[in-house]
Design a protein with these regions (language model features):
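Compact, glycine/acidic-enriched structural inserts
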Residues: 216-244
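General alpha-helical segment detector with a strong preference for membrane-spanning helices
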Residues: 51-52, 140, 208
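Active-site scaffold segments
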Residues: 43-44, 232
Length: 253
């Protein structure tokens, strides 16, 4: 979604970026973009999340293994001097900010630059195989296919306001080991991600049709798990940004 409503004082912009640049943004306390390199005469922020995510996934991830989508607001009074450029379809809109203007551009950022999504590259077979051997069970086939795609959402905000982190098989194994005592109360559990707080996104690997479920870290068993969506539908809604946590509806034993 872009912010071109002329009645607002700020314009919301998005920028795809890689690890090196986002580390420099973090070093600025999330207040400024770093100076352009000599071979980078133009700074390209874009006007919607979809386009930023497309670049992060198709350009940043293949080249650096990770791609980020950021969001920030810029004063309209400053930005109005630059025309909006259409770089393809009607949705492909961006600004071209000359490198020598970046200092002034940064001064007109209101608030902080926010990371809204991180994408990672395909997980190798070896990592899946090692985690499954250690756990003695398999991840859902649809989950493996998603994490072995060109780029998958590792963490980020949904358009619904939900925030989630999805785990690589190795991280899932580590979390399962740390959660060992509670995991014993959830036979067959496979941890797919977290809800950003105390909640884990899990599946019961004993049932190939089991949905993704939400459990508290202090859960005393599957009876308190809250079903979310079938694995394939969960992935589809994560990809669309429409996933929303369901907090009620625990499984009845």
């Amino acid at each position: 979604m872009s912010s071109l409503d002329a009645s607002t004082d700020n314009v919301t912009l998005w920028r795809p970026t890689g690890q090196e640049e986002i580390d420099l943004v973090a070093a600025s306390k999330w207040r400024a973009w770093p100076p352009r390199l000599p071979e980078q005469p133009i700074f390209y922020p874009v006007l919607n999340r979809w386009y930023a995510a497309k670049i992060a996934r198709e350009w940043n991830v293949p080249r650096g293994g990770v791609g980020y989508v950021t969001r920030f607001d810029v004063r309209r009074a400053y930005l109005d001097q630059f025309p909006v450029r259409q770089a393809g379809s009607r949705e492909v809109l961006e600004y071209w900010i000359p490198a020598e203007e970046l200092g002034a551009f940064n001064e007109n950022i209101t608030g902080v630059i926010r990371e809204v999504a991180r994408y990672l590259g395909p997980v190798p077979d070896e990592e899946f195989d090692q985690a499954e051997a250690a756990l003695g069970r398999q991840f859902p086939a649809a989950w493996r296919e998603y994490l072995q795609g060109q780029a998958w959402l590792s963490r980020g905000w949904m358009e619904t306001g939900s925030y989630l982190t999805l785990l690589t098989p190795g991280k899932s194994l580590e979390m399962g080991e740390a959660w060992e005592l509670a995991a014993q109360l959830h036979p067959g559990v496979m941890i797919l991600g977290t809800g950003g707080s105390r909640e884990l996104l899990v599946v019961d690997s004993r049932d190939p049709l089991a949905p993704v479920a939400l459990v508290d870290v202090a859960s005393d068993g599957w009876a308190s798990a809250v079903p979310q969506l079938p694995v394939g539908q969960f992935i589809s809604e994560v990809e669309a940004g429409t996933f929303r946590f369901t907090w009620e509806g625990a499984v009845k034993s």
